[in-house]
Amino acid sequence: MNRGDYKNQKHPMVWGYRNVWFDFEPSIANLMIPCSLNDLDLMHETFMSCFTTQKKASFPSPTYDGPFSAWARQIQKDQRKLLATLLGEEFFIRHDNPNVRNSSGFIFIHAMLADGFLDEVEELKSHVQNN
């Protein structure tokens, strides 16, 4: 992606998400998507059906050996537990949105404008090249 690639779009966004390779704290996430237990199971089943070569991925994490989807499901469950610790379980029990009330996991997203993303990429690239 280069700055000129999106000149005809008003405000393109780039989404980064917490996954098996990249970890970030809830304070970095500016979008949190609740997932039901059914959502988490469906994601895992879909992955196992569609990405057959990744069923036995050899290195999804230094602390886990198994399918990416099982590790991702656990991460999303852990993120829900972390939010419950930070906000209290009552936050979820009394929440107006049934998706939040019934959540078993959360996907953490860090959304930013494309220019901001490219600023960060350029800063990181400069840092890496100078070290």
Language-model segments: which ranges?
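Metal-dependent de-N-acetylase/amidase catalytic core
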Residues: 1-131
